[in-house]
């Protein structure tokens, strides 16, 4: 293995100025023995094109695009894809919001040990401070991360390979960093929290937990995502789960695979009746093999008629319905629990009046 350190950036659809600020701070490192693997996990095509143009100016960056477009964000999967391309002994998991101290790489070489994995305290910048361009030491820090915040870590690559990478169950945000360090402890590798000085600054952004998930939006999400991640974290910890992934972890979706799924144009319309939705989730989806399913869920127009409302008021038996928000939450939760290793395409229409799922259930 090369005597360098690899830095992995997991990325999707973030502002270009964040990339510039972060990579510029790497360009001025006192120690140049590093390379960057920039994993674009399904950004919109116009954004990914702009990112690729921007990265041309940084000769230490390798750009990788995985066509996880129209799938929920998974930092774990994005990192694992990067791990599959890593050729160095040590790897640092970065964040597009991070500004590095100019001696950060030099510190990594001083700190790395064979069996130790190090995670770093971070200085948080305010929204206003994040908009300013300053020398690292001149930024005003509003707060510092606590030991429970383990997202920015240096790992011995072999340690991560020994536990099968990050747990790919985790989607959206939360728990994947705490989980990977917990499993490394099970494997006998000790973590170290480095808080002697601030070497990393975090540019402000709205937190995932503060985003609105109680109503349907075109941005993929569901109400119980954070709690679901916490439950999986506690399960892994309670049962000393060392390697939660199958052997195919870190799988990149190629452009050809993406095109094959999206070339399937024939869709079936399913109304939002409870019995229809539950039949799809309980019977159709788990019992369909070796084909692509393409379904669109829409509201039954009868649900909004005067006839339906009168019958409901009078207690006359009518169909029960799910809202599209409820269908969204049921679908996404089912996909992430039972079909996380399948390729699928999931969209909420721009008018919020339909939800579409294409999923490839072919084996291999």
Which residues make up each language-model segment?
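A recurrent flexible, glycine/aromatic-enriched loop bordering the glycosyltransferase active site
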Residues: 138-155
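Acidic donor-binding segment of Leloir-type glycosyltransferases
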Residues: 25-67
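Conserved donor NDP-sugar-binding/catalytic core segment of glycosyltransferases
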Residues: 103-133
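Acidic donor-binding loop at a coil-to-helix junction in glycosyltransferase catalytic cores
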Residues: 173-180
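C-terminal catalytic/acceptor-binding lobe
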Residues: 181-364
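Glycine-rich, basic loop-to-helix element that forms the pyrophosphate-binding segment
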Residues: 67-86
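Short, well-formed alpha-helical segments that are part of the catalytic scaffolds
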Residues: 14-29
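Short aromatic/hydrophobic "clamp" motif used to bind/position activated sugar donors
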Residues: 91
């Amino acid at each position: 293995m090369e005597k360098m350190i690899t830095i992995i950036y997991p990325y999707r659809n973030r502002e270009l100025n964040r990339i510039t600020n972060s990579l510029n701070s790497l360009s001025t490192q006192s120690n140049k023995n590093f390379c960057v693997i920039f994993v674009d996990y399904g950004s919109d095509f116009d954004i990914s094109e702009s990112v690729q143009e921007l990265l041309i100016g940084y000769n230490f960056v390798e750009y990788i695009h995985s066509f996880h477009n129209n799938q929920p964000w998974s930092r774990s999967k994005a990192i694992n894809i990067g791990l599959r391309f890593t050729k160095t002994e040590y790897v640092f998991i970065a964040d597009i919001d991070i500004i590095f101290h100019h001696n950060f790489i030099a510190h990594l070489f001083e700190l790395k040990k064979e069996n130790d994995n190090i995670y770093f305290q971070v200085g948080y910048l305010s929204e206003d401070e994040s908009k300013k361009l300053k020398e690292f030491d001149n930024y005003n820090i509003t707060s510092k991360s606590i030991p429970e915040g383990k997202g920015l870590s240096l790992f011995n690559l072999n340690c991560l390979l020994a536990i099968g990478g990050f747990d790919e169950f985790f989607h959206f945000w939360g728990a994947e960093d705490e989980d990977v360090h917990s499993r490394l402890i099970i494997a006998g590798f000790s973590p170290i929290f480095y808080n002697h000085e601030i070497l990393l600054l975090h540019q402000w952004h709205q937190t995932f937990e503060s985003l609105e998930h109680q109503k349907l939006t075109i941005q993929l999400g569901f109400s119980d995502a954070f709690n679901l991640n916490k439950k999986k974290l506690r399960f892994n910890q309670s049962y000393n789960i060392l390697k939660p992934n199958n052997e195919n972890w870190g799988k990149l979706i190629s452009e050809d695979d993406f095109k094959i799924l999206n070339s399937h144009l024939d869709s079936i319309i399913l109304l939002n009746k409870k019995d229809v939705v539950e039949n799809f989730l309980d019977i159709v989806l788990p019992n369909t093999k070796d084909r692509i399913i393409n379904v669109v869920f829409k509201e039954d127009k009868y649900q909004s008629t005067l006839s339906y409302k009168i019958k409901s008021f009078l207690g006359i038996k009518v169909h029960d319905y799910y809202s599209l928000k409820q269908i969204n939450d049921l679908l996404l939760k089912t996909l992430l629990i039972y079909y996380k290793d399948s390729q699928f395409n999931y969209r909420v229409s721009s008018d919020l009046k339909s939800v579409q799922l294409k999923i490839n259930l072919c084996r291999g």
